[in-house]
């Protein structure tokens, strides 16, 4: 039987460590010798079962990206970033292919407004027993103003964002990993954290497998508008073309700064 809502176990939730705002909290991901239920290890990259499985009817895993607690995706060396993304995408798609779950999600939280609790760089892969996330996704949320198209990889700025305001999309063919995908992803995140027109300290990455393509939606996070919270109405800003030109000039022109 399919479901529309995930059920959250508060008795587990209250035990979760919080190290984004609480800097005195010991980082559980740094104590690598104490980690349990490891699934796969590739050098500093570790996939393991989530110690605090707060979601019912779900298989929850955590992907620790690095052994550097203060690392951040926009500053990883490119070979390392490609290795990390290939590791994440492979494990996500393999779990989906098992057919055990209604759908499988791969996402990342970064920063105090992202909804995350642990500051150490990580992603999550979650198998949902009775929810198909794809049923709530319209193709139009991936459409937008072209920023860069190269080697079969496209970067756009949403004209019909899912939640509202600014959402970047990158897509590539699902047959194999394309390094341009990683380059575009890193540049987009760097733009959000360093050159955004408003101070941005948080973002989410949401990966989607749709029509034989891999998408990542990159969402800078601010306090969510009440129009979306209360009524589900996304807002579209009137400076999208300016922003597309801004990131293009800073990151994708010959004289770009990054």
Where does each model-flagged region fall?
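Hydrophobic (often cysteine-bearing) scaffold residues that line and stabilize catalytic clefts
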Residues: 181
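Conserved, mostly hydrophobic/aromatic
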Residues: 122
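Active-site microenvironments that recognize anionic phosphate/pyrophosphate groups
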Residues: 1-79, 83-91, 95-114, 118, ...
